[in-house]
UniProtKB/Swiss-Prot annotation:
NCBIfam families: coaD_prev_kdtB, cyt_tran_rel. Reversibly transfers an adenylyl group from ATP to 4'-phosphopantetheine, yielding dephospho-CoA (dPCoA) and pyrophosphate. SUPFAM superfamilies: Nucleotidylyl transferase. It catalyses: (R)-4'-phosphopantetheine + ATP + H(+) = 3'-dephospho-CoA + diphosphate. Its cofactor is Mg(2+). GO terms for biological process: coenzyme A biosynthetic process. Belongs to the bacterial CoaD family. The record marks H17 as: Transition state stabilizer. One of its GO terms (molecular function) is pantetheine-phosphate adenylyltransferase activity. Pathway: Cofactor biosynthesis; coenzyme A biosynthesis; CoA from (R)-pantothenate: step 4/5. It comes from the Bacteria. ATP binds at S9, F10, H17, G88, L89, R90, E98, Y123, A124, H125, L126, S127, S128, S129. This is Phosphopantetheine adenylyltransferase.
Length: 162
């Protein structure tokens, strides 16, 4: 049995994230979606809110679980019994950083592999940052994020609209 971790900040989860998670779930026996915190960023949603959105978005995938992760990803992967880290790659912008992180993780634990899944062309332009900006200005996010997440974005930004 091969268990994988699919990490991210998921602030918020997008359809691009969900596509990578679904493809990982078809490839590996079990997938843990890890919600990471980045101390250099101020998130829009709390960890609990992001966990809730991910649980809702992945409830149709039986071999996927969702968990919060602090510290180094490779340590979390080891603690969870994951042998693979799954990362989605968008054209150009993600490769260098993700390759460096994969190399560092391999150096920290040679038993954990990094697997890159290329984003589908329809999601190559998509990022949580773009979704947050659209939502902030009151633009629809349907078709970019799961329906539950779109509702949460509308609720979050309803207070900021004139």
């Amino acid at each position: 049995m091969i268990k994988a971790v699919c990490p991210g900040s998921f602030d918020p989860v997008t359809l691009g994230h969900l596509d990578i998670i679904e493809r990982a779930a078809r490839t590996f026996d079990e997938v843990v979606v890890a919600v990471l915190t980045n101390p250099r960023k101020e998130p829009l949603f709390t960890v609990e809110e992001r966990l809730e959105m991910l649980r809702e978005a992945t409830k149709h995938i039986p071999n996927v679980s969702v968990a919060a992760a602090d510290g180094l990803l490779v340590d979390f992967a080891r603690q969870q019994g994951c042998r693979v880290i799954v990362k989605g790659l968008r054209p150009i912008q993600d490769f260098e950083y993700e390759w460096q992180m994969g190399a560092v993780n391999r150096q920290l634990d040679g038993n954990i592999e990094t697997c890159f899944l290329m984003s589908r062309i329809e999601y190559a332009h998509l990022s949580s940052s773009i979704v947050r900006e659209l939502a902030y200005f009151g633009r629809p996010t349907e078709g970019l994020v799961p329906p539950f997440t779109a509702r949460r974005l509308r609720e979050k930004f309803a207070k900021t609209q004139p």
